[in-house]
C-alpha cells in the first residue's frame, strides 16, 4: 500500500530530473571543479528540480514499462543537453574571444585549465569566462535559465516523445554555431585592430631602420596595448556579452523551435 502511494511521485521525479541534470552538466556555472565535487552539484540540481515537480505531477499520468521508461529518460537527457548547449553559447564565445586575443599577442602557449568549461584555455579567456559567470548570477540570467527550464516542461511534457525533426531544427543549430563565431569576433575585434596597428607600426619601423630588430618588442608591446585596452573595454565587452546571454536565456528564444512539437 505504501509502495503504491510513493510509486507515482518517485516515477514523476525520476522522469523530470534528467533534463535538469543534463542541462547543468554542460553549463559552466555549476561545474564540479567550481563547486568542489559532483555530489554538491547534484544536490543543488535535485533541489531546483523540486520546484517544477507540481507542474509535472499535474500532467496526465501514463503507465510505462521498463523499455518505455528508458526511452523517456533518454529523451529527457537529449533535451537537457540541447538546452544546455544553447545556454552555454555566450560562455564559449567569450572564451573564444579571449583565446583569439591571446593568440594575436603571442601568448597562446600560456594555457590554463578553465574549471568552468573543463577545457584548456588562455589567460584572457579564463578571465572573461569567470567574469561572465559572476554576471550570470548577479545579473538575473540564472533566474531566466530556470524560467526557461520550467517552461520547457509545459512546451514539451515529460510523457511526450520526440517531435518531427524538420529543416527548422537544422537551421536553428547551424545559427547557434554561427552565433558563437559572430559574438567572439565582435568582442575581440577592437583589441585585434589595436594590436594589428601596433604590429603594422613596428613593420614600418623595421622597413625604414633594418638594423633595428623591433620584432623582439612585438609581444611586450602588443600585450601592453591589449591589457590597457582590456581595462577600458572590459565594461563594454561584458555589457554586450550579458545582453547576448540574457537573450539566449529568454524562454521564447531558447525553447523555440527546439521545443515546438
Curated annotation (Swiss-Prot):
GO terms for biological process: protein targeting; protein transport. It is a multi-pass membrane protein. It is found in: Cell membrane. Its main location: membrane. Keywords: Cell membrane, Membrane, Plasmid, Protein transport, Transmembrane, Transmembrane helix, Transport, Virulence. The chain crosses the membrane at residues 20-40, 44-64, 77-97, 131-151, 180-200, 214-234, 239-259. The keyword Membrane applies. It holds the Pfam family Bac_export_1. The keyword Transmembrane applies. InterPro entries: T3SS_IM_R, T3SS_SpaR/YscT. GO terms for cellular component: plasma membrane. Belongs to the FliR/MopE/SpaR family. Component of the yop secretion machinery. This is Yop proteins translocation protein T. The gene is yscT.
Amino acid at each position: 500500500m505504501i509502495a503504491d502511494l510513493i510509486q507515482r511521485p518517485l516515477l514523476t521525479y525520476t522522469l523530470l530530473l534528467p533534463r535538469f541534470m543534463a542541462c547543468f552538466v554542460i553549463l559552466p556555472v555549476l561545474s564540479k571543479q567550481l563547486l568542489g565535487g559532483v555530489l554538491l552539484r547534484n544536490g543543488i540540481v535535485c533541489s531546483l528540480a523540486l520546484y517544477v515537480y507540481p507542474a509535472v505531477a499535474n500532467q496526465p499520468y501514463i503507465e510505462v514499462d521498463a523499455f518505455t521508461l528508458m526511452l523517456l529518460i533518454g529523451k529527457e537527457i537529449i533535451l537537457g543537453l540541447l538546452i544546455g548547449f544553447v545556454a552555454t553559447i555566450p560562455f564559449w564565445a567569450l572564451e573564444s574571444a579571449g583565446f583569439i586575443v591571446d593568440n594575436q599577442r603571442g601568448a597562446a602557449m600560456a594555457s590554463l585549465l578553465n574549471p568552468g568549461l573543463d577545457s584548456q584555455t588562455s589567460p584572457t579567456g579564463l578571465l572573461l569566462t569567470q567574469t561572465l559567470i559572476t554576471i550570470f548570477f548577479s545579473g538575473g540570467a540564472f533566474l531566466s535559465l530556470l524560467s526557461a527550464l520550467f517552461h520547457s516542461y509545459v512546451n514539451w511534457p515529460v510523457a511526450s516523445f520526440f517531435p518531427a525533426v524538420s529543416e527548422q531544427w537544422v537551421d536553428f543549430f547551424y545559427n547557434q554555431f554561427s552565433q558563437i563565431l559572430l559574438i567572439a569576433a565582435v568582442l575581440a575585434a577592437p583589441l585585434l585592430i589595436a594590436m594589428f596597428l601596433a604590429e603594422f607600426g613596428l613593420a614600418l619601423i623595421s622597413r625604414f631602420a633594418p638594423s633595428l630588430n623591433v620584432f623582439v618588442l612585438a609581444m611586450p608591446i602588443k600585450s601592453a596595448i591589449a591589457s590597457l585596452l582590456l581595462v577600458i573595454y572590459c565594461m563594454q565587452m561584458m555589457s554586450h556579452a550579458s545582453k547576448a546571454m540574457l537573450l539566449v536565456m529568454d524562454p521564447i528564444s531558447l525553447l523555440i523551435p527546439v521545443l515546438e512539437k
